[in-house]
Structure formats: structure tokens, C-alpha cells
């Protein structure tokens, strides 16, 4: 590799040298470098190994689309795997290591997988080990279960640190009139226009510098500085750098993650590592830009192959000339500016253009710099192992290619078109449409206060990007209620802006020659994998995605999805629009779990709660876990049982005989008053007016937006009194919700709600022998008959020992079951009584793990479905 740092140029500070470590070797860079640029400057070619074949991977881009250079940052508990070297800011003392390789990324023993690549094609784990001919040895899943352990152990990229995360994280909320995502020329122009109108603007940029594409253009410093000066002088504009908008949600809500201290070795102790922002904006403008595409050709994953934009950015932003003999493969106009910049920096540049001809202005640019243009040409194969050394070229068009010679090079830059970043607007259900003229998907429609501008809407010229931003701000201001400038006139800008039309180019393949061309670089999905999926019937884009894992790596298919869709459309004999595209889901880029969790870790000042049976449970072998703020039995191990063995035994015993479970932590609310029935009718999705006294009813409670908030049973004790149970975690939330409704919306209702959770202790008695156990425990056995105590019935009586009790015949397991409640002081006595009888029937105690299993097998709602993200569509409409 022959990359070198230039003496001048770029947005780095050469007076501030930074020391860092790469795979144990001490290297240096400058303030303003990314880890990727610093590695390039130090001539580090192989940065990573691929997921499946362990092929060498180098730096392929300069931004969030990077799917090759994934590294691990930090040591010990601070280790962070799968970090893009292209987006990691360099800082003094940074420690970075390669991953998914042994003993190192330069010499990886697992690269032998590449030799057996024909046996590791798409879906191999479904077929290869499912029986070995001729005797079908291992037919079925038995032997697969053994292979699976090996496969899963070898799968993955970086290794997650098992120690507790020592970093802290925060949650924050904010509001604004206009949220602008992206601070390139379009985003900056939009912020200025909106700020001048007096709008409260939040400008979000994932990079550490404002400017976007302007940072990679050598003659744009004046424009960039002017735009930034106007923004910084306007107090209406809030700037958030190092902040990624990873998702858009209902009602103008956006999820942002601010990387507060990821760029320093030793942060201030009071600062979090990352901050998760929930922003509610009246209007949103997406100036998210576009990503450059690769081409599928033989060995297109070799180190030394990257996008043309990356080559230009490393030159003009970081002052690095990434090669001396540079080939640029393109099918569009944008690569010519890159070629000119590289040539001026001293490189010998050759343009390999798939088109028959280009505009005179482009020819003049090339001629002025002595750049050779090879028309109707494209790369067929990259030559070289650890780094590209030469190209085999092909001539032709429209899928008909013939070998045409070779070209020596130490760097190949690829520009096969641009894909507007429409991910965020797609989160709101807007499906992008195919623009044939520009060979890309664009969002042709705005959605409820969300607009795309600039190259995110398919505009390639800076002036057009800025004009589209002004138009969008005008429309946003009108929607908010502000009066825009009278002189502005809204026009519709059509995607495009190049002088010469693009020549769609996705794959270069010569029928008579074997090739291994990659579509998804991170997951090692090849073009042949896509064709295999087609032959095996996985022709829907969603099936293609899951069968081949195309686009399922942590880059989300930013570099390879379009190529995969094009290959599938070719196999189907359809146009790309007919094949469609997958739906983008948040997050746009990976988000640290810690950022989503925030401070909801470890113990807080809120007191931990224990049921009245806590000591009793421990004495009987319970292993405890946390459910909300409650300590609850997780499982009851016998001898040396593992949790897996224990919960299976507990569930099986409950199904066949009887099981006892401490359910005291369930929320319990007394609903009393003349209008108690009317209140229940309003807060539950199912009616309660006709519920007889002495009966219980299961109900679903929804939030205002139709999302499930809680479920539980409510028992009618008298004409004006009910006993409501809620889930453990949502008990306080449900009570607060009911109190809010009674104070603000339904203050006319004569109802009083009171938490009685600590007054009552509860035990679930489940299984076919549950009635026999209770019949032996109550003073009046006749009350337990099927006739006297029907399903969903509620009875009050006495347990032996004159213990007052309240019993309901309720099942959350599918078997006959009851819930027994007594005053909390009687809890240990109740458990002794029930347990002694359960043992007679070979029953057992069971914990939360078995309880969850029983609920799932029954088809009941589980905690995972009550997390505030699920609608009423839970197969519970019938209730």
C-alpha cells in the first residue's frame, strides 16, 4: 500500500500529534483524524476479516456505510466491538484491535473457510448438515444440534465484553419547531432560512464537523465558513454534533443518540458516554445526503478498493493520498471531480467509465490533468491478495461483457451511482420509489411534516440542494403557522443534475469465467448467493434478505442492498420497481444498548420490595430475580439442577399435577363507588356492566394511542366494589393512570381507587390437582366443587386455621388454576398449608421462568408484549 500524508491541506491540526495503538503497534495521527484515516496514513491495509469466509477487509468508505473496517475499541470492561473505523474519532491513547480473526487480522487461521466456500453458500446451515448421503446419516435435527454449537460459536464479529459496563448514560428530552437532520449544504441552508424566520431550530449532525459533502471539496471552504458563521450567529439554532438521528416515530418524535465522550480517553467524571434524546418537533427536514454504491465483480472486496467519495474525502479532509496508481471505475459524472483532485495531488489516475461517452466539460477536466478515460469499460476482477495490485478489465454494456486487458493500480475507487438516504422517512411507512433516470430509490412524497431535501431527494448539484432546502423551510413554516418570506416561490425540483446520464451498473460478469463477487461485504453475501436464493424459491425481497442475510449486518445493507435487488430483478426477468425494496427499520446506525437503557441499571433510591413469603421462598430453595422493584422466585432448583432443567421440571409438574407460585407482587387496586362499573367500562376494552357479583373478568387496558398498557383480572365483590389485579411492573402506572382520569377527564364519576397491593399476599395454585389441594385446605370443602365454584368465579371463605381468604378460579397456564389471597400477615401460614397438601400430590413450587413458559404455551400475553410497543392486535380481540 502506498498511501501517504500530504504536508498541507485537510481539516486536521498537524500541530497536535496523537498517539494510538493498533493491534499492539504504536502509531500516530493528528487531531481531526478518524481512526480510518490514521490507519491509512500509517499504511495499514488489512483492517478486518469478513464474517463467514474470513477474507481480508480494508477501508471501503469514509462514513457510516462502512462494512469492512470494523474494529474493537478500548480494553477490559471498556471494550466496544464492531466500531466503524471510519466514524471513530482519533484521540490520544486510543487502543484499537482487529476482530473476528486468530491470531491476527493480517494472518487469520480461519481464512481456510474461503477454501470451503462452495459448502458455505446461502442457507448452508439449513441444508449441509441435515443428513449425509447415501444413508442419510444424521437425518433430522439430532446431529444438527451438535453442529449448531460449532457454527454459532464461530459466528459473529467482535466479542462482547462480559464485565459490567462501567460507563454511564443519560436520557434527555427536547422540543423544537423544526428538526433538521444532516448538516451538509442543504441542512445548513435550511437551518439558516428557518432561523431567520424565527423558528426554534435543532440541527443534528452525526459527524464532528459541520459541512457534510463540503468537507471533501477542495474549493468549498469559503462557502462552508459563510454558512457556519450565519448559523453560529443565530440564537434560534441549536447545533448538535456527534449526534445521530436513528429513528423517526409518531407525532414528530425522533430518537437521537449524542456521543458525548466517545472521542476522549479520560472524560470528565460527571459526563455520560452517550445521551439518548427524545425530540418532539413540529416539522422535520431530512438533509441526510446520499451514499455511493459499489459494483459486484470478482474479488471486489480486496483491501485497496473503496468508494470514490472516500478517496476524495481522505484527500481533502484528512490530507491523505490513498494511492499513487489509481483507477476510478464509474458510470456517472461525480467521479470526475475526484479524479481531478487526486491527479492534482500527484497521483497517476485512469478513469474506467462504463458509458460510451461523457459531456465535453468532463473530457476537458480529464484532459487538463492528463487523465486517461477508458470508455465502455468496467472492472471484471481485482488482482492481489492482501492488497489490490491490478485490475482485469472488461468491455461491453447492459450485462454483456468481454475481457479487454488489465490495468496496474494500487487503489481502485468505485462510483456506481448514489443511493439517497431515505431510511428515516421510511420509518414512518413511506416506501421509496425507483427513479430510473438516476438509478436510485427516492422518497417521492412527504409524510406528515417530514420532508427530504438535497441529495437525500436525488439532487446532485450543491445549488439545487440549497434551493430545495429553502423551499422545504417555506413549507414547514407555513405548516407551523409562521409567515415565510413573501419573495419565495415554491417550485418542484426534479432529481438529477448530471450533464451525462448514468449508465446503470450493478455487476460485471463474464459468462466463461468463474468469479466471486460480493454484494454484502460484511456478511459475505455473493452475487451467486442471490441467484441461489432465486433458484430455491426465495424471490420476495424479504425472503431474499433473510435467506441470504443480505442487508442484515450492522451496516443495514447501505452498500449492498441495491445491487442485491438488481440481481434478483435480473433473475426474475423484472424491473427493479417490480421487485421492490425491503422496509427500513430503526436504528439507522447501531445504538449502544446502554444509551437506550440510560440510568435504568443497578439499584436506585427506590426501595426494593419483598413479598411476605420472601423468607419462606428462600428457605425452600428459591433463586431470586428482580421483577420491577420486587424480588421474586426465579426457579426452585433441586440438587445440582441448572435453570433450564429446573424450569422445565416445574412447568411439567404443574401441567401434570399441581404447582404453587408466589404472585403477591401483582398490583392490587380496590375500585369502590357507585360509578365503579362505569369507570371499568371506560378503561378496559371489554365491557364490565353485566359482570355478576362473585365473578372475575380478564381485561386489556390501552393507552390513548391504542397501545397495550396492561392486562389483568378484575373481580366483582359487590354492587359497588371491585378488586383489580395488574401486572407487577405496571401497578403504579395503572393506579396513576386511573387517578389522572378521575381528576382530569371524568371528575363527575363517584369512584375511589386505592392501592391494596401490600394488604394482600397471593399464591397461584395451578394444575389438574389444584382443586384437590384447595379442597383439603379450606374449612368448607363443598365450596370447591365445580358447580359451586365455576370458571372465573370469585369466593370468600376461610382456610384451615381460620385464615380469611379470597379465591378466584383463574388460569394463566391453560390448566385448572386458582389465585388465593390472604392478609399479608397470614402469608407464611398459607404457604405452609398449601405446600404440605401439594407435596401429597407430587406437586412443586415454580418461579417466574416456568410461569413465563406456561403463559407462552397457553398463548397468553407476556411481559415482552406489554412494553409499550404493542397494539391490541394480540389475538385478544375476542375478549
Cite the ranges covered by each PLM segment.
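Glycine/proline-enriched, intrinsically flexible loops and inter-domain linkers
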Residues: 196, 512, 522-524, 547, ...
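Adenylate-forming
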Residues: 311, 878-879
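Residues forming the flavin
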Residues: 1-25, 29-610, 759, 873
Amino acid at each position: 500500500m502506498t498511501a501517504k500524508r500530504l504536508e498541507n491541506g485537510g481539516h486536521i491540526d498537524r500541530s497536535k500529534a496523537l498517539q494510538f495503538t493498533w493491534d499492539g503497534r504504536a502509531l500516530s495521527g493528528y487531531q481531526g483524524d478518524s481512526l480510518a484515516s490514521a490507519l491509512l496514513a500509517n499504511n495499514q491495509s488489512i483492517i478486518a476479516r469478513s464474517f463467514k469466509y474470513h477474507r481480508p477487509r480494508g477501508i471501503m468508505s469514509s462514513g457510516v456505510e462502512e462494512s469492512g473496517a470494523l474494529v474493537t475499541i478500548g480494553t477490559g470492561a471498556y471494550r466496544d466491538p464492531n466500531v466503524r473505523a471510519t466514524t471513530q474519532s482519533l484521540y490520544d491513547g486510543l487502543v484499537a484491535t482487529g476482530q473476528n480473526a486468530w491470531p491476527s487480522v493480517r494472518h487469520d487461521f480461519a481464512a481456510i473457510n474461503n477454501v470451503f466456500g462452495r459448502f458455505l453458500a446461502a442457507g448452508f446451515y439449513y441444508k449441509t448438515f441435515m443428513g449425509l448421503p447415501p444413508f442419510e446419516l444424521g437425518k433430522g435435527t439430532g446431529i444438527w444440534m451438535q453442529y449448531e454449537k460449532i457454527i454459532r460459536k464461530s459466528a459473529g464479529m467482535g466479542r462482547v465484553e462480559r464485565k459490567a459496563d462501567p460507563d454511564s448514560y443519560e436520557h434527555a428530552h427536547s422540543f423544537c419547531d423544526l428538526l433538521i437532520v444532516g448538516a451538509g449544504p442543504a441542512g445548513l441552508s435550511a437551518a439558516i432560512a428557518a432561523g431567520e424566520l424565527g423558528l426554534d431550530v435543532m440541527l443534528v449532525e452525526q459527524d464532528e464537523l459541520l459541512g457534510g459533502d463540503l468537507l471533501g471539496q477542495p474549493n468549498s471552504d469559503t462557502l462552508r465558513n459563510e454558512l457556519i458563521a450565519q448559523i453560529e450567529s443565530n440564537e434560534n439554532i441549536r447545533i448538535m454534533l456527534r449526534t445521530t438521528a436513528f429513528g423517526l416515530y409518531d407525532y414528530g418524535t425522533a430518537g437521537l443518540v449524542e456521543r458525548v465522550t466517545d472521542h476522549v480517553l479520560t472524560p470528565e467524571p460527571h459526563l455520560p458516554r452517550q445521551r439518548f434524546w427524545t425530540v418532539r418537533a413540529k416539522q422535520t427536514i431530512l438533509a441526510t445526503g446520499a451514499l455511493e454504491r459499489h459494483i459486484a465483480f470478482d474479488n471486489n472486496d480486496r483491501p485497496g478498493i473503496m468508494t470514490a467519495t472516500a478517496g476524495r474525502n481522505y484527500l481533502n479532509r484528512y490530507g491523505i493520498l490513498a494511492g499513487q496508481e489509481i483507477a476510478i471505475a464509474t458510470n456517472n459524472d461525480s467521479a470526475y471531480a475526484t479524479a481531478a483532485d487526486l491527479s492534482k495531488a500527484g497521483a497517476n489516475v485512469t478513469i474506467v467509465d462504463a458509458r460510451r461517452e461523457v459531456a465535453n466539460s468532463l473530457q476537458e477536466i480529464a484532459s487538463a490533468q492528463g487523465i486517461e478515460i477508458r470508455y465502455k469499460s468496467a472492472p471484471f476482477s481485482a488482482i492481489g491478495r492482501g492488497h489490490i495490485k491490478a485490475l482485469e478489465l472488461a468491455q461491453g454494456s447492459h450485462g454483456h461483457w468481454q475481457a479487454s486487458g488489465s490495468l496496474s493500480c494500487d487503489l481502485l475507487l468505485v462510483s456506481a451511482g448514489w443511493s439517497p438516504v431515505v431510511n428515516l422517512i421510511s420509518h414512518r411507512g413511506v416506501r421509496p420509489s425507483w427513479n430510473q433516470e438516476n438509478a436510485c430509490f427516492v422518497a417521492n412524497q412527504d409524510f406528515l411534516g417530514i420532508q427530504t431535501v438535497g441529495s437525500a431527494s436525488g439532487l446532485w448539484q450543491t445549488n439545487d440542494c440549497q434551493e430545495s432546502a429553502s423551499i422545504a423551510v417555506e413549507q414547514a413554516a407555513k405548516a407551523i403557522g409562521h409567515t415565510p418570506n413573501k419573495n419565495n416561490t415554491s417550485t418542484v425540483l426534479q432529481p438529477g443534475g448530471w450533464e451525462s446520464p448514468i449508465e446503470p451498473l450493478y455487476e460485471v460478469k463474464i459468462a466463461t469465467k468463474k468469479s466471486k463477487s460480493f454484494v454484502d461485504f460484511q456478511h459475505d453475501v455473493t452475487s451467486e448467493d442471490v441467484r441461489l436464493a432465486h433458484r430455491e424459491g426465495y424471490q420476495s425481497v424479504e425472503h431474499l434478505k433473510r435467506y441470504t442475510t443480505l442487508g442484515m449486518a450492522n451496516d443495514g445493507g447501505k452498500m449492498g442492498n441495491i445491487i442485491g435487488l438488481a440481481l434478483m430483478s435480473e433473475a426474475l426477468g423484472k424491473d427493479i420497481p417490480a421487485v421492490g425494496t425491503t422496509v427500513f427499520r430503526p436504528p439507522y446506525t447501531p445504538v449502544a444498548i446502554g444509551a437506550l437503557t440510560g440510568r435504568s441499571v443497578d439499584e436506585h433510591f427506590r426501595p426494593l420490595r419483598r413479598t411476605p413469603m420472601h423468607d419462606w421462598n428462600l428457605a425452600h430453595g428459591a433463586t431470586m430475580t428482580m421483577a420491577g422493584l420486587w424480588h421474586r422466585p426465579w426457579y426452585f432448583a433441586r440438587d445440582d439442577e441448572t435453570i433450564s432443567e429446573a424450569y422445565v421440571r416445574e412447568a411439567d409438574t404443574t401441567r401434570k399435577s399441581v404447582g404453587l407460585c408466589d404472585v403477591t407482587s401483582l398490583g392490587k387496586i380496590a375500585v369502590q363507588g357507585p360509578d365503579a362499573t362505569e369507570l371499568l367500562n371506560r378503561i378496559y376494552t371489554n365491557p364490565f356492566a353485566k359482570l355478576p357479583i362473585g365473578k372475575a373478568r380478564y381485561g386489556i387496558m390501552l393507552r390513548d394511542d391504542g397501545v397495550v398498557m396492561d392486562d389483568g383480572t378484575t373481580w366483582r365483590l359487590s354492587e359497588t366494589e371491585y378488586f383489580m389485579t395488574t401486572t407487577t411492573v405496571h401497578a403504579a402506572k395503572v393506579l396513576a393512570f386511573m387517578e389522572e382520569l378521575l381528576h382530569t377527564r371524568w371528575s363527575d364519576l363517584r369512584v375511589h381507587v386505592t392501592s391494596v397491593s401490600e394488604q394482600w399476599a397471593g399464591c397461584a395454585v395451578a394444575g389438574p390437582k389444584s382443586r384437590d389441594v384447595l379442597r383439603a385446605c379450606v374449612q368448607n370443602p363443598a365450596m370447591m366443587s365445580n358447580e359451586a365454584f365455576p370458571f372465573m368465579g370469585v369466593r370468600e371463605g376461610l382456610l384451615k386455621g381460620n385464615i380469611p381468604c379470597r379465591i378466584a378460579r383463574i388460569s394463566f397456564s391453560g390448566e385448572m388454576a386458582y389465585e388465593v389471597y390472604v392478609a399479608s400477615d397470614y402469608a407464611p401460614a398459607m404457604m405452609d398449608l398449601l405446600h404440605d397438601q401439594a407435596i401429597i400430590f407430587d406437586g412443586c413450587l415454580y418461579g417466574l421462568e416456568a410461569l413465563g413458559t406456561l403463559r407462552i404455551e397457553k398463548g397468553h400475553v407476556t411481559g415482552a408484549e406489554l412494553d409499550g410497543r404493542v397494539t391490541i392486535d394480540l389475538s385478544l380481540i375476542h375478549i
